[in-house]
């Protein structure tokens, strides 16, 4: 009887551990909050695109963006681009948090951020700058 119970416990433990270990976030989950954030980011993208192309702004390896080459932005526009970068980063951080919450696992936020960091870099256009663990690189 003890060995039967022990066998059942082992089987159940294996089943539950496997299902939790194999759980992966749904990066396409959608909620009203996620939709609002994505809309905000899409509306901002046209103002960022020329700065990605010029190398002024690059994609970081932590899922955000950063001013990569401030000299590529005229002095009178630098404050403006810094504000746009800050707004984009706030939305990106909120997006990762909302996707984790939408999956019912707020603790997944860091992994979701990492997944998106790779996604953004993979989708970057030729000529855009992105950050690696060793520094900046041009796609």
Model-derived features: positions:
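Sec/Tat signal peptide C-region and signal peptidase I cleavage site
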Residues: 17-23
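Amphipathic, charged alpha-helical segments and their helix-to-coil junctions
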Residues: 23-78, 83, 102-139
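Bacterial N-terminal signal peptides
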Residues: 7-17
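Positively charged n-region of N-terminal signal peptides that target proteins for export
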Residues: 1-4
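Short, well-ordered alpha-helical segments
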Residues: 84-100
């Amino acid at each position: 009887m003890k060995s039967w119970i022990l066998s059942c416990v082992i089987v159940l433990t294996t089943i539950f551990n496997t299902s939790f270990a194999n759980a992966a976030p749904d990066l396409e989950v959608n909620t009203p909050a996620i939709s609002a954030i994505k809309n905000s980011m899409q509306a901002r993208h046209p103002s960022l695109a020329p700065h990605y192309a010029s190398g002024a702004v690059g994609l970081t390896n932590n899922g955000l963006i950063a001013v990569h080459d401030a000299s590529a932005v005229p002095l009178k526009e630098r404050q403006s681009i810094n504000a746009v970068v800050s707004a984009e980063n706030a939305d990106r951080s909120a997006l990762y948090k909302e996707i984790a919450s939408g999956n019912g696992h707020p603790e997944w936020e860091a992994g979701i951020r990492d997944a998106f960091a790779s996604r953004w870099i993979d989708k970057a256009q030729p000529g855009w700058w992105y950050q690696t663990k060793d520094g900046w690189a041009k796609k």
